[in-house]
Amino acid sequence: MDSIHGHYHIQLSNYSAGENLQSATPPEGVIGAHRVKVETALSHSNRQKKLSATIKHNQSSRSMLDRKLTSDGKVNQRSSFTFSMIMYRMIHFVLSTRVPAVRESVANYGGNINFKFAQTKGAFLHQIIKHSDTARGACEALCAHWIRSHAQGQSLFDQLYVGGRKGKFQIDTLYSIKQLQIDGCKADVDQDEVTLDWLKKNGISERMIERHCLLPTVDVTGTTGSEGPDQLLNAILDTNGIGYGYKKISLSGQMSGHTIAAYVNENSGVTFFDPNFGEFHFSDKEKFSKWFTNSFWENSMYHYPLGVGQSFSVFTFDSKEV
């Protein structure tokens, strides 16, 4: 969210010669017929510093994109300011305090951090907070793009950042992520259906298993809450006898929702992506299971029913195996 700074300064003029400014009562507005003018070297210096900081901030905001327009001539999405943006920023801050604990726990359970990413802070938050439909987060769209990139044998972060390193965004990918999230937040649509349609257009379809001459999807829904994450974990790791699969995992609670993703392979292990914490890899399902159950579920604060720890839906997708 772009900050709006209001600068106020009081000026005192038309003082007679020899008048002691230091002994005068600090004025507000106009005293008698005298215009107000209080000017000190210190206040002037402070204003210069603030102006310089503002200019640098605006310049850095613009330079965060590799170019001003997308390949098809579209500008980075933004909307009018709403007070909900302030609330979402505070929620992001609370979640961002959990980042160190989650990341530090990965190595303790034999995992590796592939990429440190967090939509709850830093430059990416600055981008999504610009629009009311992405200010609360872009987890659904991020996970869809992550699945597509991984299925293509690529990295989402190579596509999102210039050179694959944090610093400058590639506007085409940033725009695509934000737009998918915006499309899924429209009042007359189902976000899951919007995401499923987008994935299908990108060559990734829901897995279907033939049963009694029918081809139903293998989506799994369940509850967490006081039951813990065991049922959720089983749904994530189940590859339906095929040996691998992509997972889009929707978590819901009393007041919020969140989406995470995973690629599960019986031979190479589990690659896990949470837009709040980053991309992690565990060489086998057992290591991932212990980490998810004994550490991640609580460290992330996802176990709270008031947050997202009440129910779940797990969607499984097929694509070319990578």
Curated annotation (Swiss-Prot):
Enzyme Commission number(s) of this protein: 3.4.22.-
Top-level taxon: Bacteria
Region: Disordered, residue numbers: 42-69
Residues at the catalytic site: C139, H258, D274
GO cellular component, one term: extracellular region
Gene3D superfamilies: 3.90.70.20
Broad EC category: hydrolase
Subcellular localization, as worded in the UniProt entry: Secreted
Pfam families: Peptidase_C58 (PF03543)
GO molecular function ontology, one term from the record: cysteine-type endopeptidase activity
GO biological process, one term: proteolysis
SUPFAM superfamilies: Cysteine proteinases (SSF54001)
Keywords: Hydrolase, Plasmid, Protease, Secreted, Thiol protease, Virulence
Similarity field: Belongs to the peptidase C58 family.
Assembly and binders: Interacts with human ARHA.
Cited function: Cysteine protease, which is translocated into infected cells and plays a central role in pathogenesis by cleaving the C-terminus end of the human small GTPase RhoA/ARHA, a regulator of cytoskeleton. Once cleaved, ARHA loses its lipid modification, and is released from the cell membrane, leading to the subsequent disruption of actin cytoskeleton of the host cell.
The protein, known as: Cysteine protease yopT1
Gene source species: Yersinia enterocolitica serotype O:8 / biotype 1B (strain NCTC 13174 / 8081)
